[in-house]
Amino acid sequence: MVQYVVEWLPRIQSISVVVEGWKQVEIKNLKDTLMSISGDEEQVEDILLPVEVEEKVDASYKFKNRGKDLEWMTKLRSKSSKIYDSSIMSLPDGRWTKEELRSDSDFSIECLNCKQKIISKDNCQVLNDMPSEFWFELMDYWHCHKPDVKEDKSSYTRFETLKPSKNEILIGSSYFQGTPATFENVATTKENDNVLCIKCSAVLGQVTAGSLYKLHKWKLQLIRSGNTYKFPPECDITISLINVVKANSCRYVLVKCKTESLLVWIFSVDIGVTLTGNKSFKRAMKLLYTNSVTTINRCLNRQVVEELDFQETSFNAFYSALQHTNALLPSSMKKIGEWTISYTSLI
């Protein structure tokens, strides 16, 4: 079986194609976003490119052997993409955003398990985004440097915690948050502060330190414009990685869950990728990852590493998705030294 990976680096308008599995590879057709290749036994494979290729070049495109058995590579020049924005802050904010929900006033959000309505126009009159990572950093700075004023402390302390009003929903990258009075179709448990669906008792989230209810998007489903949308649990971590890049440009993140840890190196951001079977990521991150304790400890000592904790469902789904994508890569593209290579979609 032939395996391949296509990487588009929009900043330099370069497309690299690596193919493995045939003794010979030739380009039969190359037009717009379609590349047709043939093998030594007249096998044909159509590969969908992430972007249109520049066909008028000085030399014709050809595959060259990489010095390894059955592995070939070519580099193409892409047409400039008018929709591409190289700014880090242009990276997507996630799914089920304020703008997306406001586009349909009749949207509803249900328990994924039993379809009980949790959020609808009946209990959602105001939608607001949660403050960005920058806000939380500012609050940390504020606590270290706030004035020593003894008289009227209320003018300062009222900004230290989030206090949404009744029927106001705060939208985070992978969760919704609101007051107990807003979420009438949920219940709580005293022993572990879980928030449960009132109908089926499925765990939807937790009670925060500020006594708000925090509901995970991946425990819910969105009904909008007659369509049903689910939130993949792995997106919880993917969006957190995007936020780390936006907030402080950190490229090393230690993803933790209980006793397990996965060190993720955010190698490339906002590139186009096509994998074996034409699995396509229009906007992707290239991630290198490892669970080697030796490598993790060495990196912690030498690099600035952001550490993030996640629930088991999100962690397992993210790790599984990385492994599944890695399995689609040609042999020499699966690892770099002690790091395993993978990709994840930004959208």
Curated annotation (Swiss-Prot):
GO terms for molecular function: cyclin binding; ubiquitin conjugating enzyme binding; ubiquitin protein ligase activity. One of its GO terms (biological process) is negative regulation of protein ubiquitination. Pfam families: HECT_2. GO terms for cellular component: cytosol; nucleus; ubiquitin ligase complex. InterPro entries: UBQ-conj_enz_E2-bd_prot. This is Uncharacterized protein YJR141W. It comes from Saccharomyces cerevisiae (strain ATCC 204508 / S288c) (Baker's yeast).
